[in-house]
C-alpha cells in the first residue's frame, strides 16, 4: 500500500519535472468476452503466489547455501502477485486530486479510451504494458518506464507498420487471429498465422486477411468478428462527467503523504514537484 502511493507520487513528480501533463485512466467493468482471460490470470497469479511463499520458506529455513538467485526469483514473483484493491484505487484517486492531476473513470475497459485519446490528439501517447494498445491502433505507446533512469521506450505504430510492410488492417488481423484477450479459445499459433498471411499475400485476393482466413475455414467467423468489433474505437466518445479534475492542495497533500511515512524537510512549497521528503 505504502509502496503504491510512493511509486505513483514519484512518477507524477517526475512527469511534472519534465513538463508532462498526465491523465490517469481507470478501468470499469470488463466485457464478458474477457471472462476466460480473467480466470486464467487469476490461476496464474495463485500459482505464482504459492511459488513465492514456497521459495520464501526455503530461504528462511536456510536449506540452500546460495539464496541470491532465489531472492531475485522472489522479486519477479512478488510483482506478479501484487493485487490492487478497490481501496487502493480510491487512495490513488485521492492522491491524484491532491496533486491536481486529472483522471478519467471508464464505464468499461480503459484501453479503448486511451487509444481514442491518442488518436484524437487529446493525448500524445499512452503509457501501458498492455500489448492490446497496438491492436487498437494507438499511434504511440510508451513502455518500460524507469523512474531511476528517467527513461521510457516509445513505440510508433506507423513506423512499425512501415518497417514490417503491413497495413494496419493486416497487422490487426494477424494479432487477433493469434489470440487477444477477447478470443483466446479461437486463436491460432502466431507462427502459423504469419505463414498463412504469406499464403494470403501470394494469392493476390482483394479481401482482407481475416476474411480470407474465414473463407478458408481456418478461423471461427463469429469469434473473430466480435473481437475485431471490440477493438474498433470509431464509436468511442469521451464523457466529460467522467473526467475528474482538481486544482490540488499542497497542505492536504503533505498531510496525506505523512500518513504513508513521508517525512518532509523545511522548504517553501510552491508546487507538488518541490515537496522534498525522506521516505523510510
Task: Cite the ranges covered by each PLM segment.
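Acidic, metal-binding active-site segment of PIN/NYN-like and related structure-specific nucleases
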Residues: 114-144
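Short acidic loop-to-helix transition motifs that present clustered carboxylates
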Residues: 108-113
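Noncatalytic, basic helical substrate-engagement surface that gates or grips nucleic-acid strands
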Residues: 1-107
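Charged, low-complexity C-terminal accessory regions
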Residues: 67-79, 126, 136, 261-263, ...
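Non-catalytic nucleic-acid-binding/docking modules located in mid-to-C-terminal regions
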Residues: 150-280
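A polyampholytic, Gly/Pro-enriched intrinsically disordered region
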Residues: 124-132, 148-151, 164-167
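Conserved beta-strand -> loop -> alpha-helix junction used to position metal-binding or nucleic-acid-contacting
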Residues: 27, 132-133, 137-142, 149-158
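A short alpha->loop->secondary-structure connector
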Residues: 40-46, 141-149
Amino acid at each position: 500500500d505504502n509502496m503504491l502511493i510512493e511509486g505513483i507520487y514519484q512518477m507524477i513528480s517526475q512527469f511534472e519535472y519534465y513538463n508532462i501533463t498526465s491523465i490517469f485512466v481507470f478501468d470499469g467493468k470488463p466485457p464478458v468476452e474477457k471472462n476466460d482471460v480473467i480466470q486464467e490470470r487469476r490461476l496464474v497469479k495463485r500459482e505464482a503466489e504459492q511459488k513465492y511463499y514456497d521459495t520464501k520458506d526455503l530461504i528462511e529455513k536456510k536449506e540452500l547455501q546460495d539464496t541470491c538467485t532465489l531472492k531475485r526469483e522472489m522479486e519477479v514473483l512478488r510483482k506478479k502477485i501484487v493485487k490492487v484493491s478497490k481501496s487502493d484505487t480510491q487512495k490513488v484517486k485521492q492522491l491524484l486530486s491532491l496533486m491536481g492531476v486529472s483522471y478519467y473513470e471508464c464505464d468499461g475497459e480503459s484501453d479503448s479510451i486511451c487509444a481514442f485519446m491518442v488518436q484524437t490528439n487529446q493525448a500524445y501517447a499512452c503509457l501501458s504494458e498492455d500489448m492490446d494498445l497496438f491492436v487498437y491502433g494507438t499511434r504511440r505507446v510508451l513502455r518500460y518506464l524507469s523512474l531511476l533512469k528517467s527513461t521510457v521506450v516509445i513505440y510508433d505504430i506507423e513506423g512499425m507498420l512501415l518497417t514490417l510492410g503491413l497495413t494496419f488492417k493486416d497487422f490487426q488481423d494477424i494479432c487477433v487471429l493469434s489470440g487477444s484477450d477477447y478470443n483466446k479459445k479461437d486463436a491460432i499459433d502466431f507462427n502459423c498465422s504469419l505463414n498463412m498471411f504469406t499464403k494470403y499475400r501470394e494469392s493476390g485476393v482483394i479481401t482482407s486477411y481475416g476474411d480470407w482466413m474465414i473463407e478458408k475455414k481456418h478461423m471461427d467467423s463469429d469469434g473473430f468478428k466480435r473481437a475485431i468489433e471490440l477493438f474498433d474505437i470509431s464509436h468511442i466518445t469521451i464523457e466529460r462527467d467522467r473526467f475528474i479534475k482538481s486544482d490540488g492542495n499542497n497542505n492536504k497533500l503533505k498531510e496525506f503523504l505523512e500518513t504513508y511515512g513521508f517525512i518532509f524537510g523545511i522548504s517553501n512549497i510552491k508546487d507538488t514537484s518541490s515537496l522534498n521528503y525522506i521516505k523510510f
